[in-house]
């Protein structure tokens, strides 16, 4: 146990100190990729939602000791940022062509080729989940599995298109104002997490608000417009045969779209985890809710944690907290069943 705790401490220290950043030149511009871990291990790539990068989308999950022991023990992590979303990014030149979702998916292929990666595990949130799903449809042989959080899969409705067209125009004229920060935070977090006049917003929301203030409006606008021009993936999803694990908060604005995606996927290869009292970013708001489903999902690929960090009754990894449905043979890769879960929110 001492050896395991030391290994987890080293992994968390590596995450806190930052990975190695690479700037990959693609046909559609340069892409920032931050790499954590041993590049000899299987690859797990991540892609964030609009206006975010890996620190504001995945830090909550990757700073959980149990998640570190599961993920960095089995994978080398490649955090891909949409163009202009990386830390210290310069404003995008107005003359540069605006990318489409197809262009962004093609960039992922170029990133994989740059690092000489074959088939990879993919993890994405909302718009990032859409980009990775599109990539999986176009390049099935390059995807081992998908972990999608509050994913998009349909073309935007007229009301959604109009809403984000207004947001895009506000970004163009005013940059990331206080009003726009509130709009994006509603996209990411539950009402409980955002607080009220009587209850302060949670620390994770406060930190996300701060990070939003560092984004360049022109870069956000380009990614937002690409997502606002997305097409329906429903038909393509029906042909996907890679194992897919989907998380969604029951207060996510994209809850119904996530349920639609689940119906489009082959039930033999997909599972849904609905997290109660949570918004879209389960990775930040309730990261512990992801641990047990991911652990059993990875077992289907022959991947395991080196040992349990804690066997106390309060630990989210203790056997008493494991859903009986996850112990079925189907959950080990033969067939994954929809479940619902709620676990403690603090790491």
UniProtKB/Swiss-Prot annotation:
Subunit and interaction comment: Interacts with the heterodimers formed by GB1 and GG1, or GB1 and GG2. Interacts with RGS1.
Alphabetical keyword list: Cytoplasm, Growth regulation
Chief location category: cytoplasm
One cellular component (GO) term of this entry: cytoplasm
A Pfam short name: Ndr
Protein name, UniProt field: Protein NDL3
Biological process terms in GO annotation: regulation of auxin polar transport; response to abscisic acid; response to cold; response to jasmonic acid
PANTHER family: N-MYC DOWNSTREAM REGULATED
Domain of life, source organism: Eukaryota
Subcellular localization: Cytoplasm
Function: Involved in a signaling pathway that modulates root auxin transport and auxin gradients. Acts partially by positively regulating the auxin carrier PIN2 and AUX1. Acts, together with GB1 as positive regulator of meristem initiation and branching. GB1 and NDL3 positively regulate basipetal inflorescence auxin transport and modulate MAX2 expression in shoots, which regulates organ and lateral meristem formation by the establishment and maintenance of auxin gradients.
Family to which the UniProt record says this protein belongs: Belongs to the NDRG family.
């Amino acid at each position: 146990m001492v050896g395991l705790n030391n290994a987890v401490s080293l992994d968390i220290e590596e995450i806190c100190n930052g990975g190695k950043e690479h700037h990959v030149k693609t046909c559609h511009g340069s892409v920032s990729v931050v790499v954590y871990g041993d590049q000899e291990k299987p690859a797990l790539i991540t892609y964030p939602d609009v206006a975010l990068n890996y620190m504001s989308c995945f830090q909550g999950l990757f700073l959980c000791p149990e998640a570190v022991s599961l993920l960095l023990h089995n994978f080398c992590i490649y955090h891909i940022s949409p163009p202009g979303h990386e830390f210290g990014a310069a404003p995008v030149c107005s003359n540069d062509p605006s990318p489409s979702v197809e262009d962004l998916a093609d960039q992922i292929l170029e990133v994989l080729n740059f690092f000489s990666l074959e088939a990879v595990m993919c993890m994405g949130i909302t718009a990032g989940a859409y980009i990775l799903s599109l990539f999986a449809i176009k390049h099935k042989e390059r995807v081992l599995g998908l972990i999608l959080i509050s994913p998009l899969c349909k073309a935007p409705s007229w009301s959604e298109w109009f809403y984000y067209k207004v947001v895009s125009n506000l970004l163009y004229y005013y940059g990331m104002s206080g009003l726009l920060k509130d709009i994006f935070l509603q996209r990411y977090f539950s009402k409980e997490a955002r607080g009220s006049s009587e209850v302060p917003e949670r620390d994770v929301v406060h930190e996300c608000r701060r990070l939003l203030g560092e984004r360049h409006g022109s870069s956000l606008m380009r990614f937002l417009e690409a997502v606002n021009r997305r097409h329906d993936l429903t038909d393509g999803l029906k042909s996907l045969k890679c194992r897919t694990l989907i998380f969604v908060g029951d207060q996510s604005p994209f809850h119904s779209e996530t349920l639609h995606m689940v119906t489009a996927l082959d039930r033999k290869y997909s599972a849904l985890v609905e997290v109660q009292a949570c918004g879209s970013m389960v990775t930040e708001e309730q990261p512990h809710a992801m641990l047990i489903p991911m652990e059993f999902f990875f077992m289907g690929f022959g991947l395991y944690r080196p040992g349990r960090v804690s066997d106390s009754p309060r630990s989210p990894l203790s056997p008493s907290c494991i859903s009986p449905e996850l112990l079925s043979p189907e959950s080990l890769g033969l067939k994954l069943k929809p479940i619902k879960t709620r676990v403690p929110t603090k790491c």
